[in-house]
Amino acid sequence: MRKLTALFVASTLALGAANLAHAADTTTAAPADAKPMMHHKGKFGPHQDMMFKDLNLTDAQKQQIREIMKGQRDQMKRPPLEERRAMHDIIASDTFDKAKAEAQIAKMEEQRKANMLAHMETQNKIYNILTPEQKKQFNANFEKRLTERPAAKGKMPATAE
């Protein structure tokens, strides 16, 4: 029985080592000059691709948009460390203090409101650098996005039968 167990362990280790060696040989490294993956981010930020699709922006317009977006990025700040710690303290306490949580939420809502206002102002600035034809296409893209049903996340598309 001991010989059988030893043989089993030895063969398992040998096969495991062979698989590791094979896996190491077949993996490919990313090129040294490759950019890191930007998940869900278009040319101008997340969810901006649909907005600018088929607008045929000029290089000057693209540069103006980059400058506008850079200005907004400088305005958009993460919640201060104290706020994040306060939120953690509420979550990690032994008892839930509803009044404290509501006060923290109110503070966070003020910041969210300011961010939304800045975002809408930025969108307006971008819209106003477009030509009349581009504005027409922009509005068509907006309407299309409103009427399209978003795909469920993590689900496979339905098969057409």
UniProtKB/Swiss-Prot annotation:
* Principal subcellular localisation of the protein: periplasm
Give the record's GO CC terms. outer membrane-bounded periplasmic space
The signal peptide here is 1-23
Q: Which GO terms describe its molecular function?
A: unfolded protein binding
Family (UniProt): Belongs to the CpxP/Spy family.
PANTHER family per the record? PERIPLASMIC CHAPERONE SPY
Any idea what job this protein has? An ATP-independent periplasmic chaperone, decreases protein aggregation and helps protein refolding. Binds substrate over a large region. Protect proteins in vitro against tannin inactivation; tannins have antimicrobial activity. Overexpression enhances the stability of otherwise unstable periplasmic proteins.
Q: What is this protein called?
A: Periplasmic chaperone Spy
Source gene? Answer: spy
